[in-house]
């Protein structure tokens, strides 16, 4: 069974597991955190926890990880079929520069090489720049990728999450 490796540079492994659990159980994460859970929700959580434990999943919450460190950890794992990184701009590099565009370019280049060397697909999450907020049309574009250029160059596919209904609904009275 192929597994998933998740590198979460923003959230702790515990926070991520709690989010996954609440999502799988369809229980509000706020209620889960404060313990305000009904009997039915406890049953749902127990079922979801059993499912989660059965997944071949590795979560690493090392902050500021480099591609080299990530690669070393992945080489020690067996049967990883997918790598997810949350998120690009929090990764570090050994490149000696303060130029964020060059740093991101180096990281995306190294990630592309790592994906080929380890023969594994990588989903690399990225922040958007604030430019999207100042436009009338809020649909994200390639130019909205923070410290972009290399992201679209090195990526095989670039996907954006966008929901019209969240941005263009009028407030309820």
Report residues per predicted region.
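Conserved small/polar residues in nucleotide/adenosyl-binding loops
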Residues: 168-173
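Conserved P-loop NTPase nucleotide-binding/switch module
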Residues: 19-26, 89-109, 135
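Substrate-engagement module of ASCE P-loop NTPases
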Residues: 103-122, 147-154
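Short, electropositive alpha-helical surface patch
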Residues: 132-152
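Conserved nucleotide-binding/hydrolysis micro-motifs of P-loop NTPases
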Residues: 11-14, 64-66, 89-91, 128-132, ...
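Well-ordered beta-strand positions
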Residues: 157-159
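Cytosolic-facing regulatory segments adjacent to core modules
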Residues: 3-79, 93
